[in-house]
């Protein structure tokens, strides 16, 4: 698992990549127990400098299993958060973000000032995301109509206004 950062949860169904800072150190942390019980037993990736900021989520004594420079992580593919676009049919239609989609990419705007050091990328909804994803040949996934309503491509939130969907996306 990677603890990714976003200020716009409604864009998560359109996630196409995760950006890291190429010179930031990241840790793979094994969570023994956490206060919520959600991550116990999991291994999560987070910027090393931010481990103390996530003590509640990572538990009292998380174990660092490995460390990596961000540049070492670039190119690693991951299973998408949502499966809406990860089907053979969607790929054939060109609706998926392409062969480089759902991978870790480098971006100079990723910092450890806030967040987790891993930044969610939805190129249809952010200029930085768009330019960075274009550099890696990652296509745009746009399941929102002109009125800001989720289309049928995102069945769980179909017909919902994007800001109304935020709380449901966060709960998922």
Name each model-derived stretch:
Residues 17, 24-118, 127-131:
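Protease-associated
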Residues 1-14, 25-27, 33-35, 75, ...:
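Residue patterns forming the tRNA-binding/recognition surfaces of aminoacyl-tRNA synthetases
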